[in-house]
Amino acid sequence: MKDVLMMILEDCPYCHQAYRIMEDLKKEHPEYAEVSIRIADEEKESALADSLDYYYVPTYFVDGKKIHEGVPTKEKVQAVYEAALAD
């Protein structure tokens, strides 16, 4: 299973939307619960944020590759889980 990093801002409404989508997807696809997602607040982990190529949050990286950036949709967040589970 691949490493997943989610860059967020604490007060970001789209990040909170992404959390809800993630919870819904885990209910629909129990195997997604096995995916460990490291959630990093760009204000608290500025060195990490500065080392990555993104502008909008939430942004998902799977094994260092940007999979999604910006406004989340169910399909885009599901693609993150699928990328993490892919061989």
Residue positions per predicted region:
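Generic recognition of short, well-ordered alpha-helical segments
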Residues: 17-20, 51-52, 72
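Non-catalytic, surface beta->alpha helical segment in thiol-disulfide oxidoreductase systems
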Residues: 61-87
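Structural micro-motif
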Residues: 51-61
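Short alpha-helical
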Residues: 13-14, 44, 75
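Local sequence-structure signature of Cys/Sec-based thiol-disulfide redox active-site neighborhoods
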Residues: 1-28
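Thiol-based oxidoreductase modules, predominantly thioredoxin-like and allied folds used
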Residues: 32-46
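Alpha-helix termini
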Residues: 26-32, 85
